[in-house]
UniProtKB/Swiss-Prot annotation:
Subunit structure: Part of the 30S ribosomal subunit. Forms a tight complex with proteins S10 and S14.
Name of this protein: Small ribosomal subunit protein uS3
InterPro entries linked to this entry: KH_dom, KH_dom-like_a/b, KH_dom_type_2, KH_sf_prok-type, Ribosomal_S3_C_sf, Ribosomal_uS3_bac-typ, Ribosomal_uS3_C, Ribosomal_uS3_CS
Key words of the record: Ribonucleoprotein, Ribosomal protein, RNA-binding, rRNA-binding
GO BP annotation list: translation
PROSITE patterns from the UniProt entry: KH_TYPE_2, RIBOSOMAL_S3
Organism (species): Actinobacillus succinogenes (strain ATCC 55618 / DSM 22257 / CCUG 43843 / 130Z)
Length: 235
């Protein structure tokens, strides 16, 4: 049975950037890696309702710079920036170095795999029919310009005795094409029947040379030279 590699992992350094960008010596690497893990775990727990897409971490000159990509920046910042200041203090304490928090707004949450998966999971927890939630997410993504999207849910769907998986796809999702910009993420819905897993793949187009590919127009071939009509011989 074929297995699927993680769409981000196989594209790292090709069309996908790393979520942590820093360089460390051998003796500091493990501490930095553990610090990144703890910072992400803390922020995801604190900002559970803030529609956080991803968290990127940089470590310039014995400090830490955290960028939070969210669809609801107002919730993260808080009144007069109070909440973000509390986060900065907590992150500095966890990392053990001065911290800086940046907020980046996600303009189109319908095209972000993490936010789409979280949305479907929250609907399943509110007892929305799973097929309706899947179809709504697919339609919204395609309406906003996605080239393709696939959604899969697994578990005791509809309270069934036996767990199963169902998926819905529209457009094309080329998992083997390395230059394809595919956003992938997962979420969990905790229902009364157990946990339902949600997976989302969104194909946004192909990337060539660091830029989105543009549909190339077929080159016009030069017209072949006209042949002189055959005569009956030389005069």
């Amino acid at each position: 049975m074929g297995q699927k590699v993680h769409p981000h992992g196989i594209r790292l350094g090709i069309v996908k950037p790393w979520s942590s960008t820093w360089f460390a010596n051998t003796q500091d690497f493990a501490d930095n890696l553990d610090g990144d893990f703890k910072v992400r775990k803390f922020l995801n727990k604190e900002l559970m309702n803030a529609s956080v897409s991803r968290i990127t971490i940089e470590r310039p000159a014995k400090s830490i710079r955290v960028t939070i990509h969210t669809a609801r920046p107002g919730i993260v910042i808080g009144k007069k920036g109070e909440d973000v200041e509390k986060l900065r203090t907590a992150v500095a304490k966890i990392a053990g170095v001065p911290a800086q928090i940046n907020i980046a707004e996600v303009k189109k949450p319908e095209l972000d795999a993490k936010l789409v998966a979280d949305s479907i999971a929250s609907q399943l927890e509110r007892r929305v029919m799973f097929r309706r939630a899947m179809k709504r997410a697919v339609q919204n993504a395609m309406r906003l310009g996605a080239k393709g999207i696939k959604v899969e849910v697994s578990g005791r769907l509809g309270g069934a005795e036996i767990a199963r998986s169902e998926w819905y796809r529209e457009g094309r999702v080329p998992l083997h094409t390395l230059r394809a910009d595919i956003d992938y993420n997962t979420a969990e819905a905790h229902t009364t029947y157990g946990v339902i897993g949600v997976k989302v793949w969104i194909f946004k187009g192909e990337i060539l040379g660091g830029m989105a590919a543009i549909a190339q127009q077929p080159e016009q071939q030069p017209a072949a030279p006209k042949k002189a009509p055959r005569g009956k011989g030389r005069k």
